[in-house]
């Protein structure tokens, strides 16, 4: 009977360990999703075909971050009205095989850096699409995030209210 009791104890211990492992795994998965949603509340934008208005939510750090596409590749974008062009990290530009044109110097939050001018065939944010967008390949951009500058944003009307930013196609007949 003592052997039988030991087997039950081992089974109970195994089930308890499996329960805790499952609980820790689920907790980690939930926390990771929660953290990602705080950083990029616009990760799952619908790609509508009509080019209708797109409303983005500000993230926990006060920035507008969204998942979009560069030449068909899904990327994380930080909307930056202070950037003249769409700035692409050098490693992402390499992966997308972006053409590197003239060398240029760029002012960033971390000082001046040397990079190259490029042209992006297509930039997509939700249902908003722009083609032949001037861009720059910038070494040293952290985290693989694309800075979505005015060479894209300037093609749309922007309206900010509270913690939301709405982008829409300009009305016909306006500037």
Task: Outline where the language-model segments fall.
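Pepsin/retropepsin-fold aspartyl endopeptidases
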Residues: 1-76, 81-175
